[in-house]
Regions:
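Extended, low-complexity cationic-aromatic segments
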Residues: 1-92, 193-202
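C-terminal anion-handling pockets and recognition modules
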Residues: 11-15, 146-203
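RNase H-like polynucleotidyl transferase catalytic core
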Residues: 40-47, 129-148
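Generic structural signal for small/hydrophobic residues in well-ordered secondary structure
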Residues: 19, 56-58, 95, 111, ...
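Short beta-strand segments
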Residues: 16-18, 106-112, 135-137, 190
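Short, surface-exposed basic-aromatic patches at helix termini and helix-loop junctions that form
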Residues: 123-129
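Acidic, metal-coordinating catalytic cores used for nucleic-acid/nucleotide bond scission
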Residues: 24, 108-122, 138-143
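Short, basic/hydrophobic alpha-helical segments
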Residues: 88-107
Length: 203
């Protein structure tokens, strides 16, 4: 991370921490309220293999508002041979969208997922002169602020009785959009990496 900070400063670039997460129709369980003496029951539809995958970036640059940029992908809706999760081309599209939105070079920090290290991904990275990549140490989620964003997302989806992949995708997007507008949350995610929350000079 320290090396990425130096490169970002030299290139007037954004530091973007990347990661992926997923949510199925079976929600995480959490404490809830019920009348005294009544056991609360959350009715869910956990059949099938529907899954909403999310790939996201928490983006940092001194003097600018912190950003959360994401893409979602829904799988398991009965289409034969449908890939699950994000592949190299999906990551490239996310990075291209972030570059257009941020209008500056990007220093990407992510983990050693096989799709991040593949020959195809390396070629896609090499084709983008505005992109520099740094890999996080193994088993170090505490260094990636977007892990906290995923934790918050999963807490907000706890006990959610989504019945279809489409309704689950809508719920995931709604919660991520709320998070995007609460920049103080994103700033809080960044502090654990040693980055000081930026005092925005411009939007």
């Amino acid at each position: 991370v320290a090396g990425g900070k130096r490169v970002a400063a030299r290139r007037a670039a954004w530091i973007c921490f990347a990661d992926e997460c997923g949510q199925t129709l079976k929600p995480h369980k959490a404490a809830t309220w019920a009348p005294r003496g009544v056991t609360p029951i959350a009715h869910v539809t956990a059949t099938g293999n529907a899954r909403v995958s999310v790939a996201g970036l928490v983006c940092y640059r001194p003097g600018h508002r912190s950003r959360l940029i994401y893409r979602t992908k829904t799988s398991g809706r009965g289409r034969k041979g449908e890939p699950k999760g994000f592949r190299e081309r999906d990551f490239a599209r996310l990075l291209d969208a972030a570059h257009r939105q941020l209008q500056a070079p990007i220093v990407l920090v992510w983990d050693g997922l096989s799709a991040h290290r593949s020959a195809r991904m390396r070629a896609l990275i090499a084709a983008r002169s505005w992109l520099r990549v740094y890999r996080l140490p193994a088993y170090a989620p505490e260094l990636n602020p977007i892990e906290q964003a995923w934790s918050g997302l999963k807490r907000s989806l706890a006990n959610l009785p989504a019945r279809t992949a489409s309704s689950l995708a809508i719920a995931v997007k709604n919660r991520l959009k709320r998070m995007q507008h609460r920049t103080h949350l994103i700033d809080g995610y960044l502090t654990g990496t040693g980055l000081s929350p930026p005092a925005p000079a411009r939007p």
